[in-house]
Amino acid sequence: MEESASVDSVESLCSSTTTRSDRSSGPKVSDTELRSKGRPIEKMYKDPSKGELPLLPVELVQESAKDVTYICPFIGPIRGSLTVTNYRLFFRCTDREPVFGLDLPLGVLSRVEKIGAATGRGDVSYGLACKDMRNLRFVHKEPDDSLKKSVFEVLMKFAFPVSNNMSLFAFEYKQVFPENGWKVYDPLAECKRQGLPNESWRISKLNDHYELCDSYPATLVVPVTITDDELRRVSSFRAKGRIPVLSWIHPESQAAVVRSSQPMVGQNGRRCKEDEKLLQAIMDANAQSHKLFIFDARPSVNAAANKMKGGGFESEDAYQNAELVFLDIHNIHVMRESLRKLKEVVYPNIEESHWLSNLESTHWLEHIKLILAGALRIADKVESGKTSVVVHCSDGWDRTAQLTSLALIMLDSHYRTIRGFQILVEKEWLSFGHRFQQRVGHGDKNHTDVDRSPIFLQFIDCVWQMTRQFPAAFEFNEYFLITILDHLYSCLFGTFLCNSEQQRLKEEIPKRTVSLWSFVNSQLEEFVNPLYVHYSSHVLFPTVGIRHLQLWVSYYIRWNPRMRPQEPVHQRYKELLAKRAELQKRVEELQREVSSRTASSSSERAGSPTRSITPVQTFV
C-alpha cells in the first residue's frame, strides 16, 4: 500500500506543541554514550559461517538429522541438515552460495504436526506453524534405530516445555550483561517523576501483598480523600478487583489518566457509593474541569451484553458530571481471527491482483485504526480539554492497556525515548497484569486456546504507525520494535513470562531469568533513531484515518525475500548515527575556532569601535 500524500484529515487532530515542564528522567542517549557503552561479555550469536553451530551458553544439541529437505515456499525444496537444541531449530544448506540457513527459536512455534504422506517410503513430513507469521515444512527419513527419538518428538518436547512439565529456556539462560534490565522500572521513581504523591493523590500500600487485587501492581496511586476501607469496597464492585487507579497525571492541568475494569452493575443496575465517591474524587483532583470522561473500550452492544454476566458499564445517572463514551474496539477473539486472516493473505505469497481487497477483508488495519482513534480521543480530552479520564474494557488488562499506553506515548515525550518506552511496557503492561502467558501461550502446545490473542502485537503496530507520522519524535527505531516482538515469543528472556507482577515474583523471574532490557541496553546503538529530536513539551496527535495507515511490511512480510530491502534499515541507521557524530564533532571544532578568532580579534582592537557579529546556528 502506498502512503497517502495528504497529511491532514478531518477525522483527526494535527500534531501540536504545548509549553510544559520537562519530566524526562535522564538525558536521551548521547553519541558519546553510544561510543563508550560496554558490550555484552559474550555475544548473543557467534558467526555461523565457520561450520560450528552458534550455540548460546547452556544451549545443548538434542537431535540432528542429515539429508533433510526444507520445502521453501519462495525458492523451492532445499536439502540440508537440521539440528534441534533445547532453545531453537537450525537448518543449514552449505551446497548453496551464499549458504542458506534458518535459525528459529522454538518459543516461536505455535503448532508442530505431521502432515500428509511424504514422497518416499519411510519419509516423514511435518509442518511448523509460527507465531511470527511463518509456516515451515520439512521432509526427512525416519531414523533406522527404533530406540532413537525422531526429530518430531524432540521438537514437540522442547517447543512446548510447559506441556511436558519442563522449564522454559529462559530459566536456563544466564548471560551476564553490563546493566540489570530488571532495575529499569522503579514505580516510586516513576511516581516522583510525575510529581507524586501530591495534595490530591497518595501512594497506597494496600496491595503490597496483592491481597486487594492479585493482578494489579503492589504500588497504587489513588485519591487522598479515599480511605483503604473504601478501596476494599470498590474492589468488590469492580471486575477482578481492578479498582480505578492513576496511570498518569498532566504536569500542569493535573488532568489524570485512570484505568480500571468494568463495574459489576449486572442486570439490576447495582450501585456502589464508594465507587461513585472514588470517581468524584478523581474529578475533584483536577481543578481545571468539573467533568469526567469514562472511556469504555468496548462496542456498546458488547458492554450491554456483559450485564447478563454481572458486568456492564457506569450509569450517567449514578455518576454525576461523568460522560460515558464507547470506543468500539472488539474483543480478543475477533483480533485473533483478524490476525489469522492476515497471515493467510501475506504468507507465503501475495496475490498482487487482489492485494488491497484481501487486506481489507482481514479488517486488521480497521482494528489498528480504532485502537489509535480511541487513544487519540483520550489524549485530546486530557491535553486539550484538561479533563480527567477513566479507561476500562471488561477486565482492564487488554484493550485498556493498549489505550492507556498509547495515550501516554502521545502525551508524554519521556515514553518516546528508549528507556522511557521500557518503563511504559513494564508499567502499563507488565505491572498492571496483561496476561502474557495466556495471550502468547509460552511453551504450551494447545494452539487452539481461546485465550490467545495478538493484543501486545497490535500495540506495537500502533506505535510503529506513529513513528511513521512523527519520524523525529521517537528515540528508537523500527528494529527496536521488531526486537521486542521477536523476544515476546522467543522465551529467551523472562520479561514477558507469567500473567502478573505477583506471579513473576512468586516464580522469582527477576532472580532466575535475564531481562530483555539487559540485552537491549547493552547495545543501544542498534536501536537509536538518527532522526530523533528531543522536545520535552511536544504532544503527538496522530492522524488515524484508515487512508493514513499502512500494513507494517517490514514485520508482517519480512520473510518474503522479494519484500526484503537490499540493506537492513537498522544498518543505515547506524551509518547515519556515525555520520551525525562526525559532523557534530566538526561543528564543535569550527565553533571553537570561531570563538578563538573572535577573542583574538577583540584583544587586538581593544579601545577601537567594535562590529557586532551575528552568530551562525548550525543544526545536525
Swiss-Prot record:
A GO biological-process term: phosphatidylinositol dephosphorylation
Biased composition (Basic and acidic residues): 20-48
Coiled coil: 569-601
Limits of the GRAM domain: 39-116
Residues that coordinate or bind a 1,2-diacyl-sn-glycero-3-phospho-(1D-myo-inositol-3-phosphate): 306, 331-332, 394-399, 439
Any one GO cellular component localisation term in the record: cytosol
Region (Disordered): 1-48, 590-620
Active site: 393
Any GO molecular function: protein tyrosine phosphatase activity
Subcellular localization(s) per the UniProt record: Cytoplasm; Early endosome membrane
Key words, A-Z: Coiled coil, Cytoplasm, Endosome, Hydrolase, Lipid metabolism, Membrane
Domain Myotubularin phosphatase stretches: 181-556
Protein's membrane topology: Peripheral membrane protein
Catalytic activity: a 1,2-diacyl-sn-glycero-3-phospho-(1D-myo-inositol-3,5-bisphosphate) + H2O = a 1,2-diacyl-sn-glycero-3-phospho-(1D-myo-inositol-5-phosphate) + phosphate; a 1,2-diacyl-sn-glycero-3-phospho-(1D-myo-inositol-3-phosphate) + H2O = a 1,2-diacyl-sn-glycero-3-phospho-(1D-myo-inositol) + phosphate; 1,2-dioctanoyl-sn-glycero-3-phospho-(1-D-myo-inositol-3-phosphate) + H2O = 1,2-dioctanoyl-sn-glycero-3-phospho-(1D-myo-inositol) + phosphate; 1,2-dioctanoyl-sn-glycero-3-phospho-(1D-myo-inositol-3,5-bisphosphate) + H2O = 1,2-dioctanoyl-sn-glycero-3-phospho-(1D-myo-inositol-5-phosphate) + phosphate
Protein name: Phosphatidylinositol-3,5-bisphosphate 3-phosphatase MTMR2
Lineage of the organism: Eukaryota, Metazoa, Chordata, Craniata, Vertebrata
